[in-house]
């Protein structure tokens, strides 16, 4: 049997052995639909279909990673210098860039997390890749991104009551470019 006939034979078998669920005239399955493995039950948290993790688990991990980065910034022995230089021996991309940047801590007590690492450009111009010196004919600008944070919403002082939290997107600088 040559390969076109084999392929046709396999196709016929797969159609014959495939799901034989009867369908009505509109193409929908008859009977009650059973939930699939990703469908939430009465006591299950829905899963994100793309990453198959619980949405709140990602947010907790995100906030934990931000907290670790802020702790590293606070405990850093490197002085907060604003020098425009590229160090190609360093692994960190923010120091190897032609528009290097450093990080500072953006603090807001009415936000969760209260501290966010925010990039600040170390050069006014950009580093020339041939001379490795700052070239002011170009401009170094911050790159902004929106990050999810929770805003603490409390009632005005005359009325005591519990604070609520609302997830909002906040724009912060995450790096610099030429």
From Swiss-Prot:
Descriptive protein name: Interleukin-17B
The gene coding this protein: IL17B
Keyword Secreted: yes
Primary localisation category: secreted
One GO molecular-function entry: cytokine activity
Lineage: Eukaryota, Metazoa, Chordata, Craniata, Vertebrata
Segments of this protein annotated with the region Disordered: 21-44
Record bears the keyword Disulfide bond: yes
Residues bearing carbohydrate: 75
Compartmental location: Secreted
GO CC annotations on file: extracellular space
UniProt-listed SUPFAM superfamilies: Cystine-knot cytokines (SSF57501)
Any one of the GO BP annotations: inflammatory response
One Pfam family per UniProt: IL17
Leader sequence segment: 1-22
């Amino acid at each position: 049997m040559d390969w076109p006939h084999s392929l046709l034979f396999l196709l016929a078998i797969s159609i014959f052995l495939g799901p034989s669920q009867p369908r009505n005239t509109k193409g929908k399955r008859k009977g009650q639909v059973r939930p699939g493995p990703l469908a939430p039950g009465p006591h299950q948290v829905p899963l994100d279909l793309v990453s198959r993790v619980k949405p709140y688990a990602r947010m907790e991990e995100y906030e934990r990673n931000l907290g670790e980065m802020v702790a590293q910034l606070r405990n850093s022995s490197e002085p907060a210098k604003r020098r425009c230089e590229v160090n190609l021996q360093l692994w960190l991309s923010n120091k190897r860039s032609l528009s290097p940047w450093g990080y500072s801590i953006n603090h807001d007590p009415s936000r969760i997390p209260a501290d966010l690492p925010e990039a600040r450009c170390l050069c006014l111009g950009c580093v020339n890749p041939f001379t490795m010196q700052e070239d002011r004919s170009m401009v170094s600008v911050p790159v902004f991104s929106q990050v999810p944070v929770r805003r603490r919403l409390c009632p005005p002082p005359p009325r005591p009551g519990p604070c609520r939290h609302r997830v909002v997107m906040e724009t912060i600088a995450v790096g610099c470019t030429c």
